[in-house]
Amino acid sequence: MEAEQRPAAGASEGATPGLEAVPPVAPPPATAASGPIPKSGPEPKRRHLGTLLQPTVNKFSLRVFGSHKAVEIEQERVKSAGAWIIHPYSDFRFYWDLIMLLLMVGNLIVLPVGITFFKEENSPPWIVFNVLSDTFFLLDLVLNFRTGIVVEEGAEILLAPRAIRTRYLRTWFLVDLISSIPVDYIFLVVELEPRLDAEVYKTARALRIVRFTKILSLLRLLRLSRLIRYIHQWEEIFHMTYDLASAVVRIFNLIGMMLLLCHWDGCLQFLVPMLQDFPPDCWVSINHMVNHSWGRQYSHALFKAMSHMLCIGYGQQAPVGMPDVWLTMLSMIVGATCYAMFIGHATALIQSLDSSRRQYQEKYKQVEQYMSFHKLPADTRQRIHEYYEHRYQGKMFDEESILGELSEPLREEIINFTCRGLVAHMPLFAHADPSFVTAVLTKLRFEVFQPGDLVVREGSVGRKMYFIQHGLLSVLARGARDTRLTDGSYFGEICLLTRGRRTASVRADTYCRLYSLSVDHFNAVLEEFPMMRRAFETVAMDRLLRIGKKNSILQRKRSEPSPGSSGGIMEQHLVQHDRDMARGVRGRAPSTGAQLSGKPVLWEPLVHAPLQAAAVTSNVAIALTHQRGPLPLSPDSPATLLARSAWRSAGSPASPLVPVRAGPWASTSRLPAPPARTLHASLSRAGRSQVSLLGPPPGGGGRRLGPRGRPLSASQPSLPQRATGDGSPGRKGSGSERLPPSGLLAKPPRTAQPPRPPVPEPATPRGLQLSANM
């Protein structure tokens, strides 16, 4: 090599001045490169074999070591530990353990049968199986001295040869050595087995029982880390979750262990009489099965063992000899233990598959006991049951604890996903900064309200605002028309902005799923995002103006300049959407009621309170008798008023709507659809009723009537709506008397008070109302 390289170098030095000497430079690299081929041939194979002994980068190694860098460090540790050191998480060790596991299970099944039912084991298949098993067990014994050991206590891996040897000699070496003695090799070499007498033969057969100690080696292979590795690989194949895979593996391991114990017990039932040369009182001699085939002997022995283990009998007959008695007791003890273990594991497995539903059932049992202890009425219990069903839907989680254990980015991702429906339907979040949306969502609390619940009570101190995920709610303000809120709306922010009291009541009309934001979290978020405070204040002021109220704090803040043009555009979008939503829900309100016919009806809860409704009907008749108006069959008669106002009464939120026939005078008139007046009754739970008779549209005369049908003056304060006697515009009404938050109607005071100044709204019909207390 040096002789060839030196002339090439000299030629290149001499050819430097001229260009003709450049081509001869090319051959030396080829000659130099072709020289080391014989030495570099085994290097790729050795390198490939070395990678098989090292941990590879996969999901399992990343889970164990944490990162790619940690895996590379572990690979360097294997290289520096010495030659032929096998890492316990390497691919070679994984496949070797899998082969040994299968071979070991085969030995645990085949060896008891061969020892028990076969006297001559010189057949070629039996010899091949024994020799192959002994060879693999001896190789496994040698490889264990070069395989790293996982120290469970310190979560480290021993790779030093001296440390591996010392620890293996102190733990599993003796068991592996005894179970790996090549008895078949000894018999084949010296050919001792044919010349053995009976005692030597029995001794040799007893030595074969030592193979059962390989059960302890099975425990060594079934370490937790390897089980997790198998589970993860099966997850990728069958696309199963970790809980389902672990549950299936646990139940299969338990069933396999019980079947293996039954197999061993059956072989033991026949082995003991065989070692005693089948005494006359043993079950084999009694059943005359000494010379039967091994298949029939094994079947009867297995049936006898399973009968004992399952505690269903003694098999074909009760034990007679003392060895059979002791074997029966042993089988019963083992069977009872396995049965208890199986029941315990199966129960724990079933409970772990649906722990959230089990937790909900346990919680609801406590609720039932609580209701029984306090003797709550049946309707309250039903409401509590329905609340739990809608709130938890059969599953209960400790959501705060689960989210609190996660990292902040993962927690925000989960909250954004679970609240995606709320964000999609709410323009406030659609036009806001994503950081603001995330800040709000992480502080929300989920709540459920039932139909009829007052979410917000007028005049109370506000400590929360609410975002509607699903449901329909009504805003009840004194002297103002109802406003409906549905998915994507929010309410309760006015008192948080002004630090005052609630300006209106909010009632749930359906089951509502809301998210609440406390005042502390509300102020903390708005301090971080001042532009969103401006948006909340703009919408709040517009809502107050729509119900005829004002707030000096909001007006003063409204007069301040806006932070930017984008904020003003967003405020306009929010205000317009809020108005459109209120207008749209009111337009859809009549469709939520019952379908009306052309006949005049009264809407009243007759099904739930027939006696109260009958009393109300009597009061209606009295009111109609004292009404100063045209004849019953004229266009302005009470029958005409009832028929024309049927569709308006369907949208009234005063009470549940049930149709009732108005009277015999209603069947003789066919009336047009446009309403002129509305007559309906509203009942509270306390037994009080209210009858309202609304007058014609603005421009027509109308007079208010008292409880006895007498005309009232405009200054009488017993009516919630104000109207002048000459038909001038007054305060708008919704077509029905608003129930106070308590659900009761107060009696009208007898002392006159000055009337409130009217707020002209000609678009809203005025009405004359009559209140009758039952």
Curated annotation (Swiss-Prot):
One of its GO terms (biological process) is potassium ion transmembrane transport. It catalyses: K(+)(in) = K(+)(out); Na(+)(in) = Na(+)(out). The chain crosses the membrane at residues 98-118, 125-145, 172-192, 202-222, 254-274, 330-350. It comes from the Eukaryota. Residues 354-774 are annotated as: Interaction with KCTD3. SMART domains: cNMP (SM00100). Belongs to the potassium channel HCN family. This is Potassium/sodium hyperpolarization-activated cyclic nucleotide-gated channel 3. The gene is HCN3.
